[in-house]
From Swiss-Prot:
MF terms (GO), sorted A to Z: 3'-5' DNA helicase activity; 3'-5' exonuclease activity; 3'-flap-structured DNA binding; 8-hydroxy-2'-deoxyguanosine DNA binding; ATP binding; ATP hydrolysis activity; bubble DNA binding; DNA binding
Region named Interaction with DNA: 987-993
Source organism of the structure: Homo sapiens (Human)
Cellular compartment(s): Nucleus, Nucleolus; Nucleus; Nucleus, Nucleoplasm; Chromosome
Residues covered by region (2 X 27 AA tandem repeats of H-L-S-P-N-D-N-E-N-D-T-S-Y-V-I-E-S-D-E-D-L-E-M-E-M-L-K): 424-477
This protein's name: Bifunctional 3'-5' exonuclease/ATP-dependent helicase WRN
Amino acid sequence: MSEKKLETTAQQRKCPEWMNVQNKRCAVEERKACVRKSVFEDDLPFLEFTGSIVYSYDASDCSFLSEDISMSLSDGDVVGFDMEWPPLYNRGKLGKVALIQLCVSESKCYLFHVSSMSVFPQGLKMLLENKAVKKAGVGIEGDQWKLLRDFDIKLKNFVELTDVANKKLKCTETWSLNSLVKHLLGKQLLKDKSIRCSNWSKFPLTEDQKLYAATDAYAGFIIYRNLEILDDTVQRFAINKEEEILLSDMNKQLTSISEEVMDLAKHLPHAFSKLENPRRVSILLKDISENLYSLRRMIIGSTNIETELRPSNNLNLLSFEDSTTGGVQQKQIREHEVLIHVEDETWDPTLDHLAKHDGEDVLGNKVERKEDGFEDGVEDNKLKENMERACLMSLDITEHELQILEQQSQEEYLSDIAYKSTEHLSPNDNENDTSYVIESDEDLEMEMLKHLSPNDNENDTSYVIESDEDLEMEMLKSLENLNSGTVEPTHSKCLKMERNLGLPTKEEEEDDENEANEGEEDDDKDFLWPAPNEEQVTCLKMYFGHSSFKPVQWKVIHSVLEERRDNVAVMATGYGKSLCFQYPPVYVGKIGLVISPLISLMEDQVLQLKMSNIPACFLGSAQSENVLTDIKLGKYRIVYVTPEYCSGNMGLLQQLEADIGITLIAVDEAHCISEWGHDFRDSFRKLGSLKTALPMVPIVALTATASSSIREDIVRCLNLRNPQITCTGFDRPNLYLEVRRKTGNILQDLQPFLVKTSSHWEFEGPTIIYCPSRKMTQQVTGELRKLNLSCGTYHAGMSFSTRKDIHHRFVRDEIQCVIATIAFGMGINKADIRQVIHYGAPKDMESYYQEIGRAGRDGLQSSCHVLWAPADINLNRHLLTEIRNEKFRLYKLKMMAKMEKYLHSSRCRRQIILSHFEDKQVQKASLGIMGTEKCCDNCRSRLDHCYSMDDSEDTSWDFGPQAFKLLSAVDILGEKFGIGLPILFLRGSNSQRLADQYRRHSLFGTGKDQTESWWKAFSRQLITEGFLVEVSRYNKFMKICALTKKGRNWLHKANTESQSLILQANEELCPKKLLLPSSKTVSSGTKEHCYNQVPVELSTEKKSNLEKLYSYKPCDKISSGSNISKKSIMVQSPEKAYSSSQPVISAQEQETQIVLYGKLVEARQKHANKMDVPPAILATNKILVDMAKMRPTTVENVKRIDGVSEGKAAMLAPLLEVIKHFCQTNSVQTDLFSSTKPQEEQKTSLVAKNKICTLSQSMAITYSLFQEKKMPLKSIAESRILPLMTIGMHLSQAVKAGCPLDLERAGLTPEVQKIIADVIRNPPVNSDMSKISLIRMLVPENIDTYLIHMAIEILKHGPDSGLQPSCDVNKRRCFPGSEEICSSSKRSKEEVGINTETSSAERKRRLPVWFAKGSDTSKKLMDKTKRGGLFS
């Protein structure tokens, strides 16, 4: 034992001196006595930053703000710089930089919370590496190495304030930031340990943390400025003080001080009893004693420090605590610098563990307080830092010493592994199913990492993957660790929570579907508020160009003007929500404050308002024009501000309210307030103080996307008081929805949306293509440019000027298509976007709805397409694993599952979207479109193949046996692997990944009847339905598949009962031919059809018609010689397309209107270019359509067009000249308003007036589906999402209108008709057909009510009715909007129960003679209701 002790002692003596903690303490003890703190430090006021703090946690916003900073700074300008990171060491790794602070002026500081961002923002990186901008701070050299290690960012042109101070002050001090603040500013920093040592990586930061961080950066900025203006001749310190300070002056000062002290000593006995604060006096005396001691040492010196009298230390001052904690933080900074420098040279994983233990020892020693109460903790710790840093950075360590350190670290590392390996799974558990490369834009992940729970105190050792190479290396390391058995499972907690994942079940989905099945409601409701008066309508027309308010608009405006009430308005895109906040201040004559996060959109709206003679401005940090003075003078009606500016300038708003008056405060895009929304922004959460500061000003929160939970969150966060909540329908009836699968070939995927011109390809109108990553945007752009297509790329990695140029060119129609990440779109003010294409699966329903909302804002027909692949869903699911807030992550998983169902579904896509937003008026909003070929690809498919929802919608199959096999396989393999291994098990694979023990199981190889891709698709279906769940296991790149509670319960039940599981089938699980209804046969000339892929081979006539419906011809390609019949501009909105009361115009008139429209578009483009404004701001497409119809020639007449204000009317004068010239050249009428019509159109209207079917939109659709498509009533009811009774009543109204109807197929057979007629003729009815209730009571219950109504209408019309017993073969459609010949529908003898031709003939002879006149009526009707084009 003694020998071992000697060896140990010898080994310890060989260790370097700097490793001996005792020696280190002694060295510090010897040097600390010369450092004394100022006696006045405790009385110094605290330095506090009073300007506005811009807190950004989103990578995209951070890039934008950084670029704004760069643009606002000149070369050589300086910003205050500082960084924060968690103080803890975890598993041998130091915490990464969590927060970067930049102070650009005395009034503004930016906090960039990079720990909540998935990747480091490109704009911030460019700013930090910009040599033209100086970054000033203390310890900034260490910060440089920290940034280089954590993010590979080379901080350039940094200024170390310590060096500048020593140079200016001619001294050699070791300064801390606090000591510089004390010396130069006469203040001190508030160093609260609970704040400075808090976890800076947690989201969001507290207000105290924000103020602390901003103050540090501000201190660096203001110190640099003070040092710069400090004259070199001013010397506060000198190396030889005798040369700078006269001896006589020092004598005078010392004598004066001694006299004052003696005088105080004389007065003390009499004044002591009257002292209010004796303790404070004692503290001041102690401070004086300390400084006197220091002064004595400096002047006289001391030969014996040990025995010399020292000041009393019996008081425990709070300042010592501050200084000690300050030392801890500074020490950590130095240690970070050391480790960073070492890693940059040669970094070995074992050094992580060495650094960890060494760091812990040092920290432990640092926290211990010294007994000497007067010691200056800050300076003491600075001395320690310098010593330790010098030691650690020293190259004097011997090779033998280094080997000892490495050996110790390796032994600890291996022992830790040996302990943990007993709890690990076998090294064979190394499956990695998600081995795809992530190349994602910050914008796609903008919400994934920002919703971190404040209570989540777990240490996260993962780091952000910033490149493909990092990802691949991390995955390779993961596999190596698996093979060596050195990885600890971390999935148990996630697995426990995700087993109960509340993904939407089939029952829940059906509840959503049935939400609207409550019967039809009236389109118009009587409102309880008074109509606008004449003065209000005049103001509306003068400034906004409208003759009336929409009902919901007036509801909001009236409550603001008359009741001064808060409002939450959820309005579909294109409804006109901007009028709700623009009109009140214009009418009242005061200021309206509009808060919006979108600078580009605000600039466009300001321009648009100015063109309508409404004074408006944008007020913000990026505003170049000085408008603040004019605002205070009340010269502006509408003022746009950012949420950051608003929250930082409450005093200005209160001043405006007091001096001028604020009519309202509008919060646009209010869904950004909610943490559960798809576009949450923290700056919006601060707007809750608005109501406190301005309690009498009504707040109007507006958005286009907000479910009920988000609406509640908006009310709560804004502190709204008894708000009026108003919702329009979420439906956008002019948008056609379509989903397709990607093929992997970009050009092949996008070609269906392109048209070929003489020289190049082009889209059918302005188009946005959304991509999930920057890399994909560049790939798509490259492919499209091969076709000479004018397009541009837009993403956050581009410079601000480049992005602004792309936006400018797109809104001015200089480029036709923008390929962008989701950073683009919300801020665009372009109403005529015809197509929105998602090249990749959207991440959730809310963001998808917001993005497609960019299309068709002018009310004209537009289309929205999704091109996706299963890998897109995998990528989105993987990104969700980054969310540390478990509750929010599960919520996002549920939202993503809904999106996945949308992509797979064969149901009406419009219905899926509307049911997600809980639209209670889903059927009301969609009566004119849902179930038609203009609704979505699924609805069009049903119409093309004449089958109903019964046959096709969500075709259900029993997948019970397959589900039992797959769930059992996952369970048998212990839920330790991804889905790949259970599939190999079921398919009987010989792969070495599958252990031999599993090959003897009875289920092994039982799934050979299905392909591997089928099983993977089926597993995704089970995940979507909530039977399986994927969770992270070893690290975030590897997933295991586990049973949820729902899946385990089903499996247990299937073991004992029947194995039945009814799921929705899609094209991956069932062959396409099986998805077609068995009762229907597709003709041999029709291409095999897939429900999720629309492009089927159509007849020439139908194809031409669809092109007319959905195509858009650019202005520069239109001429009088164009083939307009095949490709028109665009049809009108669907609300009017199905209204059979619209007059039918002649082909000549339609041709005239279309050619004139093309000339107007050209003239608008030229005029807009001269004015340097976007064409759509000058005049929307809808205004041009109306101008082509009405052909006004005077300014007064153009004002009569809806949407043309007085200001705009004058600007449209050049377009009136175009109309005059065109009409004179072609000899056509002008100024065609309600009192006049084209001569030929008048004649046509007179002929058609008495023969047109006066059916509503909804009734016309039902009639067409029944009479022409030959769909059964039940199928129509399911397709239209309406009750069967409602469908029947639609047909009874068709009978009343005199439209031909196949009565027998409707259910009104002669037998039923006779029963009803007998009831009506006999008592007690006695032929009184007004007694509907009595008739209903007497007619047998099995006869539906709508049949009674039909029979009554037939009896009323008598022989003049145009009804028919069956559809004539040669009859054409009477439903407006189609030219397709109605197919014959001959019923078999079995269907009608007739056995012989004779009996059939006798039956026909018994029918009323007037039944045979249907053919005539139908022909005349069809002639009248032929489809018009854009201008019908």
